[in-house]
Amino acid sequence: MTPTTTPVSNPDALAPGTQDVHTLKGTLQRLAPGTPLRDSLDRIVRGHTGALIVIGDDENVTSICDGGFEFDVPFAATRLRELCKMDGAVILSSDIERIKRANVQLLPSPTWPTQESGTRHRSAERTALHTGVPVIAVSESQNTITLYVEGKAHMLEQPSTLLNRANQALGTMERYRDRLDQVNNRLHLAELHSYVTVIDVVSVIQREEMLRRVGEIIDGDVLELGKDAKQIQIQLSELRGDNDRERESIIADYLVTDGIPADEEIYAALEAISHLDDKALLKPANIARILGLPPTEEALDEPVAPRGYRTLNRIPRVQKFLMDKLIVEFGNLDALLNASVEDLSAVDGVGSLWARHITDGLGRLS
């Protein structure tokens, strides 16, 4: 499940003012199987002719074009394939609706760094860095398609390869989801009966992050597969569930802060967890440290008390601002569970209807 996108020699070295013209994600969507441009690229690969294609015709591009001939004709897969039989580059409009030039010699600055060895790929990489627009190189000898964009080199893979990898990743994700559900249910019971320990919390956070990571890998394959990924998208959505909201809720419950944690503090903790490598993620002490809890082996069995966000999150239609009001007033889940309808309705902004709804919901959960 190793991604095929690799950084170029200097990923931050893009021409001024061009960084936001095109993105890797947006370009991959336009190169997905079944799109006109991908159809043309597949024809070129089968014909063993090679190609150099620039997606964009702004001033940055035209300033490095030499020779060839200019015209302005509608894009067609067969037309692009025929034009790519010539030695030079083909220039497309940014929306890939028209072919603007053909048989062009590209003259990007030779000072742009490149890790490529072949002439076509060196020119493609330097042109992408110089202009900030996506450039595609099709290898005549290796039958590969490489996209250069946003300072990255991304080799396109065959749909069958992507499908196999995505299906394998879905199997892994299904195992992660099963294990997450187990530790999640165990934590939920511990929260309701006031015997939560640090390791209970850490175990859930670890598995939520593992689920998120494998989901991101599948997202990349889904993006490249385009319409061929519909079934995978359905399975991915089912396995992912509401993982993002659940991750926020558990951090809100257990992050050590003065008072209830601010959104910025929650997102900072999630960001810190996402930056842990796979090996570091498996060490409970690293998660405990991010939460502000003692990162020692002995402290993992220490009791901790949830604020109540995770449990309130299980009650339909209870919004975050109501949760904040209740938790500010009662302090933790145990106090919330012992509160009466009258106690809840006395909180500013809650009212009797919400108080009854929340009390009934807590009763069902416990």
UniProtKB/Swiss-Prot annotation:
Its EC number is 2.7.7.85. The gene is disA. This is DNA integrity scanning protein DisA. GO terms for biological process: DNA repair. It comes from Corynebacterium glutamicum (strain R). Participates in a DNA-damage check-point. DisA forms globular foci that rapidly scan along the chromosomes searching for lesions. Keywords: ATP-binding, DNA damage, DNA repair, DNA-binding, Magnesium, Nucleotide-binding, Nucleotidyltransferase, Transferase. Its cofactor is Mg(2+). InterPro entries: DisA, DisA/LigA_HHH, DisA_sf, DNA_integrity_DisA_N_sf, DNA_integrity_scan_DisA_link, DNA_integrity_scan_DisA_N, DNA_integrity_scanning_protein, RuvA_2-like. It is an enzyme of class 2 (transferase). ATP binds at residues 88, 106, 119-123. It catalyses: 2 ATP = 3',3'-c-di-AMP + 2 diphosphate. Homooctamer. GO terms for molecular function: adenylate cyclase activity; ATP binding; diadenylate cyclase activity; DNA binding. The keyword Chloroplast does not apply. Residues 21-159 form the DAC domain.
